[in-house]
């Protein structure tokens, strides 16, 4: 009950910043439109709408990292959170309270991307629903990573780290813009060791109905999601003790 009350407060706080929220929801759509236009003039298999849309939905989750990091960092710098530290809320309650309102936003962003892609030629099938459900583990990872960064860094720092560095890393290491096999070597190995490319490949597999292939990518995403969530809770608890 205490956790849900805090989650409700966080949801209201997120909605108080509609500009950043609209940017996070709208920017993936702009990319989808631009790359679809590029595909129409210079055909590239990677940018075909059925291949592109699943990747864009995964890339869009990087903005959830920025949202969650900024929310926690702002609260840490305010007197409100210091007062909340005196309540019976645990570190897990705080982390889940931040995460719960962001998950529907992440899923909403994914739904909007798929709906937006339909007029652009996206194949309509029940697999879209599976792809939306399948993106949840990666959404948890992105949100938890933001909570971890927000527990460590200040507001200005998370803007540069999560808004700039992480967004670019997730784009380059996910294989959305280019085939990682074309680069190969150490770069491809690093990408394979991280969850981004696995999330993109899983989304593509779910959308195409290849559930066997999708299952091969679930484990690394799940492990990263659990590990980062635990790290976020631990770091938040340390900050509570310091303050």
Regions found by a protein language model. Name each.
Residues 19-20, 93, 158, 189:
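Residue-level recognition of membrane-helix boundary sites in multi-pass small-molecule transporters
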Residues 13-41, 49-69, 106-109, 165-171, ...:
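Hydrophobic alpha-helical transmembrane segments of multi-pass membrane transport/permease proteins
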Residues 32, 36, 114, 118, ...:
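Transmembrane alpha-helix boundary and packing residues in multipass membrane permease domains
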Residues 42, 46, 123, 174-228:
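Membrane-interfacial helix-loop-helix junctions in multi-pass membrane proteins
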Residues 236-243:
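Short cytosolic juxtamembrane segments of multi-pass membrane proteins
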Residues 14, 65-89, 243:
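Transmembrane helix boundary and interhelical loop/hinge segments in multi-pass membrane proteins
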